[in-house]
Amino acid sequence: MRIVIKNGIVIDGFGGEEKADILINYGIIKGIDKNIDVSDAIVIDAEGKYVLPGFVDMHTHLRQPGFEEKETIRTGTESAAAGGFTTVACMPNTNPPIDSEVVVEYVKAVAQREGVVKVLPIGAMTKGMKGEEITEMAKLKKAGVVALSDDGFPIMSAGIMKRVMTYGKMYDLLMITHCEDKTLSGEGVMNSGIIATMLGLKGIPREAEEVMLARNIILAKATGAKLHIAHVSTKGSVELIRRAKEEGVSITAEVTPHHLTRTDEAVYNYDTNTKVFPPLRTREDVEALIEGLKDGTIDAIATDHAPHTKDDKKVPYDMAPFGISGLETAFSVINTFLIQTGIITMKALVNYMSMNPARILGISNGIRVGATADIVIVNPHEEYTVDKEKFKSKGKNTPYHGMKLKGVVEYTIVEGQIRYQKNKKFEKVEI
């Protein structure tokens, strides 16, 4: 399949930004120039639109195997394509967890057969994600995991976590940590503060995140492991990460679109779609997260896409599961609240959502001749109203339902194949 993308504003991920055409032939970018004309090619007119390296999500929950009522690899990757993501890294909190090479191979096989975008498995740090016995990391790496994490089941034992990092360093595996001291978070369901008190809901204090983050930084410094901090949510965490980077610790961090744009005030109406972990914090925290993103303390924007069924969320707030379905609104949310307001540029977004996540995960990305054609075309000016019922994901749990957002994904191209086109039903063609 040959594709020519014409007249778009190309941000290549390497510092370049220009109006140009792109020629794609059999999955590879063959030309970037003015006025490319070839016969027998699909022509995409990108006039007035941005042509960007495909987004890479470091933190996606695809739920398969074990929780297919919430999401499958098929529906999750369809959702990813609709959001402009060409690659997603899937968390190991499945049933069974991704803690053995057998489960890794299963995920890869299903992704190859049914996936719409590229899927990178993340392996568990401990068997069953129980925080007791470390997994066989050499076998997991050989099977194809790109990182290790126990996701929402943080390892409470510092001794075991140090062993995990020591072996992770040995096998050159990225350590992705969900920083939570469960003795501090307890049964909390939202940010600890005046709003939680007013609503009669149990709070989760900042210290629950910051204490565990501080411990993990100390262990990473001691072992030399590559540490990545998932879904940073507090001002104190930003300060800890900034200091760690200044001290030379091998540390990177991510923040979600919802933590960058929403506060605990969103919980006022007890909408369970605002229940997420870590919880939505205060305006002061949001401002610190944005500043951390801008100054390089935080490296990436990741969705923490956590789909749930409608019945899961149709319960009292304190009984509902944590999680937001975030793949399909990520670009629009960042574009609306950060780009259109002048806080960051589209070129910066490419770093946060395309290039830095790829670099951290150890994969290639970017638009240049000879590169794999993983590309997203976006219209930053088109406004739409979020309708959760139109999501490709099984998870309709979004706090943005009914909200007007600016910025839509027009096309998602994965290895030279059109995997998503706005307003067109998708039919998978083998890559």
From Swiss-Prot:
Pfam family, any one: Amidohydro_1
Sequence positions that bind Zn(2+) 1: H59, H61, D151, D304
Cofactor note: Binds 2 Zn(2+) ions per subunit.
EC id: 3.5.2.3
Family: Belongs to the metallo-dependent hydrolases superfamily. DHOase family. Class I DHOase subfamily.
Classification via PANTHER family: ALLANTOINASE
Name of the protein described by the UniProt record: Dihydroorotase
UniProt organism field: Caldanaerobacter subterraneus subsp. tengcongensis (strain DSM 15242 / JCM 11007 / NBRC 100824 / MB4)
Record gene name: pyrC
